[in-house]
Amino acid sequence: MEIKYLLTVFLVLLIGSDYCQAFLFSLIPHAIGGLISAFKGRRKRDLDGQIDRSRNFRKRDAELEELLSKLPIY
């Protein structure tokens, strides 16, 4: 009976330590890296690139619509 409880506690501690290790070694360094890149202004440059890509996409979409409107309907 005692071994059953001991095994349960051991498994709970093992799972808990695994989650803590994943939190400490993946989430925190990524958060620190994100803050550093935000202070350096890389994030702003990334957003500018996304805006340009969005404009290009809209331009290509409009050109495609124009091309499709000129095609005959069968």
UniProtKB/Swiss-Prot annotation:
Residues modified as Lysine amide are K40
Q: One GO cellular component term, please give it.
A: membrane
User: How is expression of this protein distributed across tissues?
Assistant: Expressed by the venom gland.
Provide one Gene Ontology biological process annotation. Answer: killing of cells of another organism
Q: Mind listing the UniProt keywords for this protein, alphabetically?
A: Amidation, Antibiotic, Antimicrobial, Cleavage on pair of basic residues, Cytolysis, Hemolysis, Membrane, Secreted, Signal, Target cell membrane, Target membrane, Transmembrane
Keyword Secreted set for record: yes
The subcellular location is:
Secreted; Target cell membrane
Its signal peptide is 1-22
Q: Which protein family is it in?
A: Belongs to the non-disulfide-bridged peptide (NDBP) superfamily. Short antimicrobial peptide (group 4) family.
Q: What does this protein do?
A: Has antibacterial activity against the Gram-positive bacteria S.aureus (MIC=20 uM), the Gram-negative bacteria E.coli (MIC=150 uM), and the yeast C.albicans (MIC=64 uM). Causes hemolysis on horse erythrocytes.
- Return the protein name: Antimicrobial peptide 1
